[in-house]
Each structure stands twice: as structure tokens, then as C-alpha cells.
Amino acid sequence: MSDLNVYQPWSVPLLHTSLSDNFIQKLIQLTDVIAEDKEEQESIGSEVSGEIKDEWKIDPVLLTNIKFTDNIIRLGWEYFKIVLNNFQIIDNKVPLALVVFKSALENIEISSAWFNDQKDNEYSPMHKHTGILSGVLYLMIPEYLPSRKNKDTDGAITFIGNETAQEGMISNSTLKISPKVGDIFMFPSSLKHEVYPFRTKDGKGVRRSLSFNLNTDKFIPQAKWFLKSKITSENIPLEE
């Protein structure tokens, strides 16, 4: 992976990095096989919000076989370290919220994955995912026609945080990014986002992106206990 970039115009981080060309090619080959065998594949279109025709499930086992899952879990730990650095740690004691997050990561897995072949004028309205962490990776991007109004939003993904009127003076609740092939973004599953449509010269352009959710069954009861007890911190030492 290349250098990590962190975008945080609101309170939760959005992690951005890129995968190697070799890895991207493996994922393109995998998704090509699925796309070419549509009659035997399971569409995820009814389960996600996108106004996109071709959206297909990926068995997480297939991603494990090509070591994609290992890379994503490592990225999840990088995300944890970023969050940890944003917390105030006093006397080497970790807030309970991070203890819960760390426990989740120790047992986390890709709970669902899918890809879509987005075509001209298709889009995905504002939505959020299920799970703990989610991500999107870009495998193929066509050449877009210029925007009619020069706003450079065609084909962009926009992340949307929470903002009050006062916060708006010193922060920005939205972040618009025009992704490139190989770009991968990781974010809390609750972070809302939307995808703009685009146009291509022949009207046959395809942008392929792969999305995934990370979750663990062992995280849920701990999270409920934490919220129910209303405990805001607990003295648990950091592990070496």
C-alpha cells in the first residue's frame, strides 16, 4: 500500500490509500468472472440503495483466497491507530469506546461484499452501510464528458458528516472526492455518502467499484452493554 491520507472535516476519520496495480488486476479478473456469469450470480441490487442495474454479490471467501481480506483487516488496524491518536490518553489508560473497538477488530471479518458496474446517468443516493467499518475500492474508471456547469461533481463520491450551524463556521460537513483507479476509502459504516452520476462520450462507459462491510458477532453484546451502562471511560491498560 502507498502512503495513508486522513480526511477529517468532521469528527470521524475517513482513511484513503491505494492498492497496487497487481492487486487491482486480481480483483478485476475476479469481478470479470462474476460479471460474465450473471445468470448464475446473485444480484445485490434489491439490498443496496444505488440506482444501478448491475450490482453483484461477492462471496467473502473469494476475497480471502486472493489475500484481499488480510489487507483490509490490516487497514482496519491502521484506522484504529488513527482513532487512538485522536483520543486523549491519560496515564496510559484507554477510553472504553476504544476498548470495544479494539475487541471488535480482534474478531472482525468481511461480512458482506459486492461490486457494481455503474454506467452513464446511474447514481447512488445518500445512504449508509451496516457493520462497524466499511469501504469502497475503485477498479475501473472511464473517461467522463466535461461537466455541463464546470462543478467537477460528475462521478464523484461525497461523504457527509453531522454538522450544526455553529460547527459550520469552523468545519465542513461534506467532502467530495473524484476517485482514481486503485483508490480505497475506509470509514465508519454509519458515515453517510452518495455517488454522483456521470456521462461518457459513447454512453457506454463503465465504472467498477467494490464495496465491503466489516463486522463481528462478538462486538454486538459489548456495544449494547457499553451504551446501556452509560459508562464513558474505563481504566484498561494499553497492550504492548
PLM regions and their residue ranges:
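Double-stranded beta-helix
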Residues: 211-240
